[in-house]
Amino acid sequence: MELQWYVGLDWGKSEHQVCLLNATGEHIAERKISHTGSGFTELTTWLSEQTNQAETASIGVALETSSGPVVDCLLALGYGVFAINPKQADRFRDRYSPAGAKDDRRDALVLATALFLEPQALRLLEAPDSDMLELRERHRMREQLQRTKQGLALKIRQCLWSYYPDFESLFGSDLGLPFVQAIWEHMPNPEAAQRRRKHSVEKSLKAHKIRRFQADQILQQLRAERLPVATTTARLLQEQITLLFQQLALVQQQLQEVMHQLETKLESLSTQAPTTNTSSTNPPRPTDRDILASMPGVGIFVLANLLGEAGVVIRNRDYAALRCLAGIAPVTKKSGKSCRVQRRRAANPRLVDSMYHWARVASQVDPICRQRYEALRTRGHTHGRALRSVADRLLAVACAMLKAGTLYRRTAAET
């Protein structure tokens, strides 16, 4: 439905400024709403009154973000939601105040006017389906837990370095393993290691199926003389490390649960019944999940991130939007005889990270990707730039496969 009403919403943490224009661009009304359930109910009632009970699909809302609770609420209410880049909004604002004056009311008016004058410059947002939304949120939970785990491990290493450096040098990179936490419970200091028997350490190694370490090696290093720090300092650090290990064990358990849920969800997407080509003469059309999973270099986390963060773009088979969203499309700055091609910085950081790992692994396992990567490196391209070029090709192939509904065919050299 064609837009008849234009709303600018300058969002904030506790309050949002709203400005309403009609079909001719005339300023109708403005107000503030609170960031609460009742606040959005008031917004719906107010817009209905001001627009003479117009349908929500005929009302467009422009704001300077493409995600978050405000966007989710507006999409759920049925409004057309348009996102504008903050840099674009700054240029629109300069039309009204070259001096740079800025306030919430002016920003809301600028957003509404931008949607009225140049709707093609804004991006229409679509609500992701429940599967893509679940993948996105679960993958973000995994990333957050992974960062928490790394932070706890760094704190433990710092405390160990302060009074028990032998333990840190032996297990510093493996602190998240249950085996290391079991060793700490029995040998939190050199004195406890002196009392520990070789047989008990071997039993612990066998119980956790650890072969990289030997009991003699562990006991020899942990029984070494400790740093000459005060007894009280050592005791308090030991208590702190014990608490950190307990937190680390909990985070590790939660991380495994989230990863299992992520794998289960991806598996369910693969087993969903296709909606086309279900006749007996034609094979069933593979799902988007199966098509992307067949690509070289795509693992569980890359697949979940692609479907979760770019699910709408993938559903629309929009290659140009996907390469911009993933930071693959370069930025060209040309003026006169000067022409510079730069890396795109305005992109989804999670997709940028996934593209890097996708291209990196594909360059290792796929002969075509490896050949392309080596050719670019020979021409003097940096590692990152070569990988972005490989990722660009992979995205083009993936979009073509999604349109055709075919799986990636590996060469004989790969198999």
Label the model's feature ranges.
Residues 1-415:
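A detector of single, family-specific signature residues
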